Amino acid sequence: MTSLLGLAVRLLLFQPTLMFWASQVRQKCHNGTYEISVLMMDNSAYKEPLQNLRDAVEEGLDIVRKRLREAELNVTVNATFIYSDGLIHKSGDCRSSTCEGLDLLREITRDRKMGCVLMGPSCTYSTFQMYLDTELNYPMISAGSFGLSCDYKETLTRILPPARKLMYFLVDFWKVNNAPFKTFSWNSSYVYKNGSEPEDCFWYLNALEAGVSYFSEVLSFKDVLRRSEQFQEILMGRNRKSNVIVMCGTPETFYNVKGDLKVADDTVVILVDLFSNHYFEDDTRAPEYMDNVLVLTLPPEKFIANASVSGRFPSERSDFSLAYLEGTLLFGHMLQTFLENGESVTTPKFARAFRNLTFQGLEGPVTLDDSGDIDNIMCLLYVSLDTRKYKVLMAYDTHKNQTIPVATSPNFIWKNHRLPNDVPGLGPQILMIAVFTLTGIVVVLLLIALLVLRKYRRDHELRQKKWSHIPSENIFPLETNETNHVSLKIDDDRRRDTIQRVRQCKYDKKKVILKDLKHCDGNFSEKQKIELNKLLQSDYYNLTKFYGTVKLDTRIFGVVEYCERGSLREVLNDTISYPDGTFMDWEFKISVLNDIAKGMSYLHSSKIEVHGRLKSTNCVVDSRMVVKITDFGCNSILPPKKDLWTAPEHLRQATISQKGDVYSFSIIAQEIILRKETFYTLSCRDQNEKIFRVENSYGTKPFRPDLFLETADEKELEVYLLVKSCWEEDPEKRPDFKKIESTLAKIFGLFHDQKNESYMDTLIRRLQLYSRNLEHLVEERTQLYKAERDRADHLNFMLLPRLVVKSLKEKGIVEPELYEEVTIYFSDIVGFTTICKYSTPMEVVDMLNDIYKSFDQIVDHHDVYKVETIGDAYVVASGLPMRNGNRHAVDISKMALDILSFMGTFELEHLPGLPVWIRIGVHSGPCAAGVVGIKMPRYCLFGDTVNTASRMESTGLPLRIHMSSSTIAILRRTDCQFLYEVRGETYLKGRGTETTYWLTGMKDQEYNLPTPPTVENQQRLQTEFSDMIVSALQKRQASGVKSRRPTRVASYKKGFLEYMQLNNSDHDSTYF
């Protein structure tokens, strides 16, 4: 006990140092220098001289350097050897090596000797503790660490066969029943383990002894022999229960345990001796005491199994030294792979890459499985009575988990060239055998009859139960007045997603929810039917009622009671409707916890027994603020998933339990107390990381959410302590829900007694607070509604005329209307296709955006309506939808002069010096207008006036305002004195020849109009414009100006907003 306490104190002292590694471990693993940190511990799994191990690593480094040079990678690869000399804790063997390993780690941290990979230790105890406590994404290569506790470690690679591989071989060999030498499947065995075995044998036998191991699960009988006397008694005894004994060691070990006793002919001893090569030497002769022994060992490299294994060449070095060399070559292989791919070797990806691969070892390819453990070919040897040599009986490929029989007619000691059955013979007691056989047959027949009767009664009960299937015609959709409701949470996507997942309907005049039973086709198994019947029988105040199942379309739904206020998670999130000052005070929080505890207490005592999916989203609130548990039962239909509410033991193993429900209750309690996100903690925000840390947290301080105990008063502290007891790491330390229910009742009494008021006083006070909160809520949401209405109106006014919007709001329709006289403006950019030819698409978009934003500002200063933009065409009308007498021609004319004046100053950013010419055409006359379409409606103009205005623009000239005679006639009727010139007769398609005019200005008002180009011939005009573009491009290249896209943010600095970007009137305290 004292030594264990010292070890625990030592580990706690080491923890701060080990956690400091994060900034030190990569000191020698970058900038072309890569080192291996090799732990040289005297207590290794084999008593191999440390110098041999160092020589093996150096030899491996020479091979790695050569391979890197051949790959043309100019890097430096070295090794740092860390010895245990001078350590405070220096152990004598592997079983006390934990502190020695941690001391070495501390020395590496202090001296910054850590390289890219840590090689060693080989002892299971030290390896497991180093992996567990470092908490680093750091690769470890071990020549040993055989125990099951080192299996499936993400950053640990083992170069020698672990106990798991041996266990799988024995299980598969026990199952063999169709080989020439083995016709019986074995189901029993003895295991000899006296505790003084070497490191490898200790862990191999420990794996076979473990009751939860794969080997123990498949055997019907297994017993462990711990003393040589027991071994000898079983070896010779007639009352033994198995003919097979498994032990580990050398032939000498077997002889020392057996002594001079003669072994019975039907005894089979499996001797595990993986790392001895003398069985393959020519001069090796098997002693007679090995006749009943099958030896399991590893053959030399490039060994091909056959009837005789003599004449092979065993390796000059031990398997342990070879493992250090192979580990060095593995590091070189991974380093070369990452460097050739341009990836860093200091990332978690590198630490987890030492698995599921094949690399070139010293004598051939070496394969690692997806857990980072080496795969080998194991051989099972027998003694040939003819030659007294060891021969191969069968081989086993650990990579494929495949047995390969080799011998067809082995000449071993057992009869008929076959291994005996594992069960000893019963002798000539034929009568007794017959009696037992007959009795067994009678018992089996009776059991079959009972089972058939039981099944018939159960099926009859299931048929009589009215659980079954609710006809789809009994499920009715909700009425319109039941589904329509006003909600100001316009952007609440989560509510919309929830409505899509669940369906609200009516069943038996009650509002219900249809829950989708995924992966279910309606053909329920017997187990599922029993679960559904249990759900029907569950009826409690704090549980939602289950009514049955229904099939809609091709999907199966569960019909469940509906609760109006939604899930508890939604209530906690809604701080407006349920503020802390009224509903969510401490009394109410304890009441909510008590409701959950009552529901779970009833559930655990019912036939359902366990929930398995308890979380805040599976706790719903009805209209009376009563919390009810839902989504329970049907675990065979809806298996539980890993999430933040799942207990750590169920994260590690996908099961459910009542204690796991208690843990889930504690996470919900933390949500209720703090009203923050699920599993709230300041140290971590990522959900997947939280689940990982809970699943892999061990020791005295597991990972849990935050509870701010320092700010809690005495009564609140009682609640916190209850929550902490519910999320204990040990499930047995957690209270049950009966205890939780009684504790909450006491705590509620403490809160209530302090205020010296009756329950009625408390109820009246809470109702008054709630009433005031509702008044404030209505006022606030009214303001929010008005602000949103104004935003919608403003958006509509930017899309349609104000009168049209008003008509749509009041009547729902817009009647088309005929206007006797309006003026329409058309303009386009001269040479637009030529400009596009010399510009990128984004430059064209930015050019049009800059021009038309300026046009829009000019339009805002006149009584006109912008109809649309089509490419480079800009269309404006006046006199509609509101008639303005003769002002329509005046406003269009003034607007056209303003636009032409602006174009005289406009310059393209990507084509400096190039003038932008536009043609403007104006015409007046009658037209019809109305809203066309339902989706994206537009206010459109129709009539010959529109076509004529377009013709006026197309027949005009650059930087000219081309006006028809009808427009000039209207201008003459006004008091405004416009200046214009007669152009002469112009041919207009569809109208013939008409007299048209150039608008040149306005008397008593100066316009800075650009000078139109003097070229009259259209062909010469196009040539001149193309020359201007070429000149602008040359100018841009000469000045080094690069085209750039103007940022949209720049428009805000000019005092106006971009398209459709309205001022945001949202409040942080709402979902608006």
From Swiss-Prot:
EC category name: lyase
Domain Protein kinase span(s) in chain numbering: 488-748
Name assigned to this protein: Guanylyl cyclase C
Family: Belongs to the adenylyl cyclase class-4/guanylyl cyclase family.
Domain Guanylate cyclase: 823-953
Membrane topology label: Single-pass type I membrane protein
A GO BP annotation: receptor guanylyl cyclase signaling pathway
PROSITE patterns: GUANYLATE_CYCLASE_1 (PS00452), GUANYLATE_CYCLASE_2 (PS50125), PROTEIN_KINASE_DOM (PS50011)
Domain commentary: The protein kinase domain is predicted to be catalytically inactive.
Disulfide bonds, paired cysteine numbers: none
A GO term for molecular function: GTP binding
Signal peptide: 1-22
Compartment(s) of residence: Cell membrane; Endoplasmic reticulum membrane
Alphabetical list of InterPro entries matching this protein: A/G_cyclase, A/G_cyclase_CS, ANF_lig-bd_rcpt, Cyclic_nucleotide_synthase, Kinase-like_dom_sf, Nucleotide_cyclase, Peripla_BP_I, Prot_kinase_dom
Glycosylation positions in this chain: 31, 74, 78, 187, 194, 306, 401
UniProt main location, coarse: membrane
The reaction(s) this protein catalyses: GTP = 3',5'-cyclic GMP + diphosphate
EC annotation from Swiss-Prot or TrEMBL: 4.6.1.2
